[in-house]
Each structure stands twice: as structure tokens, then as C-alpha cells.
Amino acid sequence: MQLQGKDKKVHFIGIGGAGMSGIATVMLEMGGYQVSGSDIKRSAVIDRLENLGAKCNIGHKTSNINNEIDAVVYSTAISPENPEILETQRLGIPLIRRGQMLARLMKEKKGIAVAGAHGKTTTTSMTALILEENSFDPTIIIGGDLSNIGGNAKLGQGEYMVAEADESDGSFLLLDPNIAVVTNIEDDHLDYYGTRENIAKAFRQFLAKLSAEGLAVICLDDPVLKEITTGLTCQVVTYGSLGSGADYQIKVLETRNGVNQGEVYFQEERLGMLELHVPGYHNLLNAMAAVAIGRHLNLDFEKIARALRKFTGAKRRFQVIGKVNGITVVDDYAHHPTEVKATLQAARTSHPGRIVTIFQPHRYSRTKQLFKEFGQSFTNGDLIILTDIYAASELPLEGVHTKLILDAIPLQEGQQVLYLPTLKDAADYLADYANPGDLVLTMGAGDVWTLGRELIKRLEEK
């Protein structure tokens, strides 16, 4: 179905979600669309969309769907039994996957798509900021809010679109970008892919879609990526750590005054210094992908570095929620062992005091597949608090419980691990036992982010 012409009516099921809201925002700003949507609860994102002209309903109901709607957009987070899905099918209204709609929007621009198991949102945000700060006026669709643009999306008048490419359900294969980034490949979303080999095959297909004039930006620190990029017909530029053999290499320097620093080299030529106000080696690597794109678009390194100095992070990516009574509260989306390990490493390098981490496992399937790896990822935590699993759209699996992760943690001297089932239990405990000098770090892809706000409130009331 071609969504062209005046006042086409498009309905989004789960419009407040990170990926859905970005697409809805761009369509609202384009004009020519009447956008409606539904979500299970009101949020700042819903308020923002309504201010742009969207009609949003709270709750998924059959009555939200009618014959005047031209198309309904949904994501894999929406159950096939959702009443709005069923009503859409009954009325014969076209159902469009979120990835299909993103692909349609990208066809109107020169697409820059960022894929990978980890670092997508940050790398997309950094790339978007570089283009935004250097007058490219890109269209942007990100999986997290970027303070520099006041949200997670914007319609630009320039020729480029920068977007996050979601591999979780294979929908990134619908995209036809001009530039594609792959940050890394991991054993994630095995509920969809089945095997690691299938994951690697999908990323290979993603890169193989690039034309001869296209550009693949690849992290050479990932051994799987080294293998799957062989024989690509597009242009390939690589980035990685010092000594990796990549085109762009980063020499990590000591963090000073909270500034994450590194020297950037291109084929052994020193380009200059990179300074980031977000911690962690993984963020320096993310920045290297953005540097490679900026240079491909003929930007001087100093202009790129200047833009990145303004980067303060994306929402829920090592986001400082607040500081009260000497206690710093930070929130991060980390929900895979590699992300948990990298986030705690960033916390350790940037914070001299005790690190208290609250981790909410996300999905029963992921916990079952990776509980041993999760157990090994908490090395840099001093006090580790584990809560019950956030189910997302899954049903419980027999024998799968947070205790699997707890039992897999090899306790080090001075480390303490607690199981506190609910976020309220964790908030009650931390309100009494968090100390001045602590960094309290909430991690997970569920609703654990609410804990940081609640803790700040409790500490302010003390």
C-alpha cells in the first residue's frame, strides 16, 4: 500500500514506544498524515506526540480502530492477540510492521542505519549530533531521547536520515541505507534467530544490501564481524582499538575531570584528540564509528570532535538522574551481559566510591540463555541487587528465575549480592542503606528506571 496523498490516516499500536514514537514524530512533522495511536499508559512521550497533533488513546481497545484508518503500524512487542490487531484484521485494514514504515521513510532520504547488538542508540545519537552541528539538518530517528534535539526524532530538510536499525526481529533487513554501521554481534534475540550462525547470516545480508557506492562501517574488535565482511562489494571502513589493524584506531587516555579521552588515528596518521562527557571505553568505540561517517561526508576531524564534545548522552544510557546527600543515581538500559559489564566498567573508571547496582533481568528467554554470562558480568559492582525478571511480552518459563543469575555470580572479597523481588523492596532498602559517596546504578530494559526517580524522592525527603 502506498501511503501517499493528503491526510492519510495512520494508527500506531504502542505509539509511546521508543521505536514507534520516533516514526510517528517524523510523520507528524512531514504533514499530510493524520496520526493516531494507543499505549498502555500516559507518558512524556505521549504528551509530546499530542502536542505535535497526534490523537492518543490510553489502553488497547477495539474501539480505537475504525474503517477511516488507512494503515495500522505495529511492532513485535505487540501480541497477535491484541484487540486492535484483531480488529484491524477483521476490518481488512493493512497492517504494517514498524520496520516497514521506517524503510519507507528512509527511501525518501540518503539513509545512515546503525545496527549491532550493543551501542546502537549511542552511536546513532553521536552520528546525528555530528550532522546536526555541521548544518546537514538530518532527519533523525533514535531509540532514546537525545537532549540536543529535545526528543528521539526530528524531520530535517537535509538529504540524510540517521536511524537506529533494529535486528531483534530481522526488520533491519527491510532497510536500504547508503551507509550502514555494525557495532558488534552477540548471542541475543535467540528466541527469533535460533542460533548465533543465523544472527551472523542476517548481519551479512544487511551489509550485502549496500550498493557499490555504499559504505559499511565495521568494528574490527568484533571477531565475527571480521569474518562476515569478507567479499562485500561496497566500500568498507573499519574502526577499533589501538593495534586492531582497523582504519580508525583509538588510543585510550586517562580520564581527567570526568572527561573520557582518546587519541584518534586514521591509517597510522594522528587526527587529534577525542573528548567525551560520557564514560567508558565502549563509548569511545561508539564515537569512532561516528567519526568514520563524518569523515566520509568530508568533515574535518576537528569539526567532528567539537560536535562530540557537546554530546551528553542519550536517555537511559548512563544517564545521571540526580545527586542527593552525596549519593549519585544513574540509570542505564543495559540488559545483556556484555552491556552490563561495559556499564559497570564505565562506572568504575569514572567513580571512586562504592558502586551499588540494581539489575532487573529482562525476559525469561534471555535469562535462560545467558544466566551464566550474566553472573560473570558484575565484577565491578560492590553491592549487587537483583530483582525479579521483567517479563516483557513473555510467559514465565519453568525453572527460570533471578536465582539462576544470583547463583552464577562468583563473589569476590568485599562484594555483596542481594535478591530483592520488587522495585519497592529495592527502594526501601536503598533509602535506608545508601551512603554518601555511593553511585547507585539501575540497569535493565524493563521498568527499573522508575526506581532511580523513587529513590531520589525518598532521599530528598530524609
From Swiss-Prot:
Annotated gene? murC
Keyword Ligase present in the record's keywords: the answer is: yes
Q: Which organism is it from?
A: Desulforamulus reducens (strain ATCC BAA-1160 / DSM 100696 / MI-1) (Desulfotomaculum reducens)
The protein's role, per its UniProt record: Cell wall formation.
Query: What are the UniProt keywords, alphabetically?
Result: ATP-binding, Cell cycle, Cell division, Cell shape, Cell wall biogenesis/degradation, Cytoplasm, Ligase, Nucleotide-binding, Peptidoglycan synthesis
Name recorded for this polypeptide? UDP-N-acetylmuramate--L-alanine ligase
Residues engaged in binding ATP: 116-122
Q: Per its UniProt record, what SUPFAM superfamilies does this chain match? A: MurCD N-terminal domain (SSF51984), MurD-like peptide ligases, catalytic domain (SSF53623), MurD-like peptide ligases, peptide-binding domain (SSF53244)
Q: What is its EC number?
A: 6.3.2.8
Q: Report if keyword Nucleotide-binding is assigned.
A: yes
